[in-house]
Amino acid sequence: MFYFSEIEGKRILKSDLIKNAEAFFTTRDICICYKSEDIQNDVQNTIESNKKIICDSLKIERENLLFPTQTHTSHIEITKKNIKNYPDTDALVLAEKNLGIFLNFADCTPIILYDEAQNIGAIAHAGWRGTAGNIASKTVQKMIDEFNSKPENIVALIGPAIGFCCYNVGEEVYQKLSKTVSNFERLYEIREGNIFVDLKNINKRQLEEIGVQKIDVCPYCTVHNNNLFYSYRNENATPYRHSAVLKLN
């Protein structure tokens, strides 16, 4: 079950499914910017301060907080302390202690994975392109291939994202998503001639089909809860983001 907590008086969203790692989703209280060149210096200072808040909560140095350049792909990388740049990457696998990872979101689906037995984890960024590319299940497969994870030991948190209520798509996107899981008829609806898809539960189904059983799906829609989370669609392509954060204990 998801619940709100705080770090330095700023709201974050956690799940009681993960107890042995630091895993949470930030809110608008901890603003991060996707394109720093689009913002003024005072906002940039706030964003750097917010990154420090995240680092302090994880008890790590700023240089040990790693994040990729997200490009709406299904490319996955394994983090290493001596590698700071992860270009063209939409999922990071974390196997080292004293490192933190975070990815940024505004409507796309954030997925935190944690293997309780191996003490490794990952964060995946699943927009419609990543979802169509099965980034959730591919990240699990990476954990299996590289670290001998077993799906039954993996916990998945599917965080705040645009909901089934609001995510209408065109025919091309619908067709691509419909090929990623079985029984897709339960994951879309036609309303007044428009196609709506359930992106969070498509990712849940992908995880279930690779064997992940313990999955917590956040009920918050980023459009309907725009006071808590950023929404690309609802805020005229805002450059600001909330984040998914993970550190191993």
Segments predicted by a language model, with ranges:
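Active-site microenvironment for binding and transforming phosphate-containing groups
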Residues: 1-249
